[in-house]
């Protein structure tokens, strides 16, 4: 997957930008047509030319994995009980009932910020212990939950 490759090679800003653009395009097509499509045209805001309506297919990654991992910046490592939260959005965002392995359930919230360099205000609730690494434009902080 392109986004994963960009992230693994350190191009976090570009991965976030591409993910945000793709997510916005899928949302716009959904709003215009009232359905999710199997695939989308790469250069216009419409379904792909051989796309089936009411068929999630790969599009299902956009409102789940792409939203959580690349827009919200959540990168879980369950075996190590570690969660990296790479905060790039300025808007308030978060996830309720975020599954963390077979037994973990997290509630994650990040308050709105006025600029990327501003330290994020994070609220987390968890039913298990973990290490949370928060990354933002001007810093990094590790918390034990």
Predicted regions, residues:
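Non-catalytic C-terminal accessory modules of carbohydrate-active enzymes
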Residues: 1-145
């Amino acid at each position: 997957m392109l986004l994963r490759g960009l992230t693994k090679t350190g191009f976090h800003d570009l991965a976030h930008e591409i993910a945000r653009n793709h997510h916005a395009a899928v949302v716009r097509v959904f709003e215009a047509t009232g359905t999710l499509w199997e695939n989308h045209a790469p250069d216009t805001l419409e379904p792909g030319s051989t796309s089936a309506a009411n068929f999630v297919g790969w599009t299902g990654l956009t409102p789940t994995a792409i939203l959580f991992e690349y827009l919200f910046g959540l990168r879980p490592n369950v075996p190590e009980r570690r969660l990296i939260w790479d905060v790039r959005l300025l808007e308030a965002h978060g996830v309720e009932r975020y599954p963390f392995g077979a037994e973990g359930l997290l509630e994650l919230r990040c308050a709105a910020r006025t600029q990327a360099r501003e330290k994020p205000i994070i609220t987390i609730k968890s039913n298990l212990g973990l290490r949370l690494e928060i990354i933002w434009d001007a810093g990094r902080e590790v918390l034990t939950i």
